[in-house]
Amino acid sequence: MESPPLTRPDAAATTAASSEAGLKMAGLVEPEIVAACEQAVLRLYHALDRADYATVLAQFAAEGTWQRGPALLRGRQQILAALEKRSATQVIRHVASNFLWSARDGQEVMAAFYLTVYHSDAGAPVALPVAIDRPFLAGDAACRLTCEADGRWRIRHMAFDRVFEFPA
């Protein structure tokens, strides 16, 4: 379910030069922008866990990039191609927490957060709940979101660095 767009009066004023300028943070992010951006990130992971790839893709800008392991996926087509290779029998949950938000300008924000992943794949469909003894992995995630012309905040770039792996 899509949330209504958060319209910014200066949404059309973004230029490629201003949105791609250096990584200097401009400061705090307005609460309504934090809410809209956090919903985009959480909506992505909720959809990813349920193999709802159309909703996952809708959270990315058309030219968005996603660093997934060693692969840098560029654009929605590459992202979809990678997602379609995921196991249809896995049960997975991504838990995003401890968000820190910074503004670059009125049209772009950065987020740093923790991501813990719980995973099981028996190779065949299973009944819930699935018994596991530990998380699959945990680490640091980051993303950059931009306010697009339609007033929605979408992910321009997302990356994840593994910090903890849990032996089987």
For the regions a language model picked out, list residue spans one by one:
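Short, low-complexity N-terminal intrinsically disordered segments enriched in polar/charged residues
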Residues: 1-54, 58-59
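Outer-membrane beta-barrel domain signature
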Residues: 88, 131-132
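Soluble or luminal CAZymes and related metallo-dependent hydrolases
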Residues: 36, 93, 137
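Charge-dense, low-complexity intrinsically disordered segments
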Residues: 27, 31, 73, 132
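Short beta-strand edge/turn micro-motifs at domain boundaries
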Residues: 2-9, 108-110, 133-168
